Amino acid sequence: QARRLLREAGGEAALVAKIERAEAIENLAEIVEASDAVMVARGDLGVEIGDAELPGLQKKIIREALLRSRVVITATQMMQSMVESPIPTRAEVLDVANAVIDGTDAVMLSQETASGKHPALAVAAMRRVCLGAERQFEPVEELKPGTHRLDRSDQAIALAAMFLAGQIGVRAIVALTESGATAQWLSRYRSTVPIYALSRSAAARRRMQLYRDVNPVEFDARGAGPTQAVRDAIRHLFVLGHLAAGDRVLVTTGDHTGLGGGTNTLKLLVLGADGIAEGLQDL
């Protein structure tokens, strides 16, 4: 119903379901499936179901979101002591880190930045802890043939890209995406390989800021054929300093640039000294 009302009002914003009631846990799978993203609202949820149950339910919500390829945000009192203190407690550090290790896409501050004494330090501390936790990366799930139901071409391409990234040693995955859908699929399969999502759509780039491991980059491929668009994209990342000569990268793209939902191609590239892609070959 919320999505219908949004569309009738002419809106295209993503729907984030805030999980904060016991009734939501009883219908968790249905809520996650109907949403674009979910938020683990630990304050109100803890009051509803009790402190002892909260850690396990946080992990359950994150797992359910990952299983259904939805974005998940973990929030509430993550660095509460920094409302007053310039440094977080060790317990808060572990709390944030464990949420990242469990697979959350984003962590959220509230009072720490809304009315706290050290808002910038709180953001810096959370960023530092998140980056440290990502270095302790362990895959949430193994990419094995037959373990994923693939309903769309972009989903299949994303799974193939993440599987290959773990097998052939690439520097990055580059997704030319109009809507950001391919980047979302890529972010569902955990990897240590950075993902650069190139899109001309400001709305898509803002949405992709929430996707784990995804770095949105402004890029307009309209007017270029598929092969030239790929070469231009790689050159663009080279100029920005994200890629270097000799890097091997995987690229996902479609036959028609500028159209959403058309990702159907996976390519392996090697960068030359000037950032021009060489050895282009379809996989």
What residues fall within each predicted segment?
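Non-catalytic helical/linker scaffolds that mediate oligomerization, partner binding
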Residues: 1-283
